[in-house]
A protein has these predicted regions:
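Acidic Gly/Asp/Thr-rich repetitive segments characteristic of extracellular carbohydrate-active
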Residues: 19-72
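Extracytoplasmic/secreted cell-surface and envelope-processing proteins
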Residues: 81-84, 142-147, 171, 239-240, ...
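Right-handed parallel beta-helix
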Residues: 93, 97-98, 126-140, 156-169, ...
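Long, contiguous C-terminal flanking segments immediately downstream of a protein's structured core
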Residues: 3-28, 38, 78, 278, ...
Length: 350
């Protein structure tokens, strides 16, 4: 896999390694998860709080019972009404295989599903989660969720892959992973963040944030968000990052972005970041309007270093043919003033 070039080699390096599952691609494709460990069966949709008796057979019990390899499968289907957020940072080495659920599968409600938010290495920051999570719906809503919770997300960890996740109805972003290493989010839907909810900052219907080192974000549908559709996370200035904040090259490709708000930022960010943004499909919708955000590939910063090519903007042949001139350089924030041509050209990775 080579950054800065069209992707023709995904899967070629580490060719003797075993994929997390057939069809796994990108930076997290060799995650082992619970391979070789216990098979744990979810037999109840019940959940429990910290001050309550643990419920064997629940999803939470399977996650929190151990940090030894385990694969979680489902004998039940339906809605799990979480009594608090699910966190993986202290419970690594697991696979959650949602497609084993009968019927209509599994939906997580009420609270967030978070891989790691800690900045403390003692409880996960910078550590390997070694997690495979597939075929779940994460729709917390705002009846109980904290004012800043994502539907699914995490930061400052390494070694994980999520696949066929549907995320929505979140107070903050729907699907957000940044500062991560050896990570993939693939074949996911992230839609309908709640714009007017209980976020402390007010209107906050945001889509996703992406960044990392050897991290991949591909085949993701982002739809119906006020902003961050997606946000390429800004990084700290070189030499100032913390050890747990993984920064390097990451890959954003083959995604679909639909109906971002023309009053929000749409797709933006990337200060000090190095990344691919290739072959994505931008489809303005009823909320998008006709201002310059309707053909925005990315509103970025001259410090970004990116390979941007092959992105298609429905209804705008000019930006489709030339992503950079109006789709990126023409989208600079006015606070940057006039950006010299040399700084514009320096953004382009060959």
């Amino acid at each position: 896999f080579q950054y800065g070039k069209p992707d023709t080699s995904i899967g070629d390096d580490h060719s003797t390694s075993i994929l997390a599952f057939p069809g796994a691609e990108g930076g997290g494709r060799f995650t082992t998860g619970g391979r070789g460990g216990e098979i744990y069966r979810v037999t109840t949709l019940a959940d429990y709080n910290k001050n309550e008796t643990p419920i064997e057979g629940s999803l939470r019990y399977g996650i929190e019972k151990s940090n030894q390899p385990r694969t979680i499968i489902f004998d039940v289907s339906g809605i799990i009404e979480l009594k608090r957020g699910l966190y993986l940072n202290e419970y690594p080495n697991l696979s959650i295989i949602g497609q084993t659920a009968p019927g209509d599968g599994i939906t997580l409600k009420n609270y967030n599903f978070t891989f790691n938010l800690s900045k403390d290495p003692a409880i996960g920051a910078g550590g390997s989660l070694n997690a495979i999570v597939r075929f779940l719906r994460c729709r917390p809503g705002d009846q109980f969720a904290d004012y800043g919770e994502d539907a699914i997300g995490g930061r400052y960890f390494k070694d994980a892959i999520i696949d066929h996740i549907t995320a929505g109805w979140s107070v903050d972003e729907t699907l957000t992973f940044y500062g991560v290493q050896n990570f993939t989010a693939q074949w996911c839907i992230a839609s309908e963040s709640m714009n007017l909810s209980n976020h402390a900052k007010g209107a906050h219907g945001y889509g996703a944030m992406f960044s990392g080192d050897n991290a991949s974000f591909h085949h993701i549908l982002l739809a119906h968000h006020g902003s961050r559709c997606p946000r390429i996370s800004d990084l700290s200035a070189p030499g100032t990052q913390e050890s747990y904040d993984f920064t390097g090259y990451f890959d954003v490709r083959n995604n679909v972005y639909y109906n971002w708000s023309g009053r929000g930022q749409g797709s933006y960010g990337g200060k000090y970041a190095a990344f691919n943004l290739t072959n994505c499909y931008y489809k303005p919708g009823p909320a998008t309007g006709t201002n310059n955000r309707s053909y925005r590939i990315l509103s970025s910063d001259p410090t970004a270093r990116a390979y941007i090519n092959g992105n298609y903007v429905l209804g705008n042949t000019g930006v489709t043919a030339d992503n950079w001139t109006e789709g990126v350089w023409g989208q600079f924030d006015s606070s940057l003033g006039t950006v010299p041509e040399a700084e514009k050209q320096a953004m382009k990775m060959a």
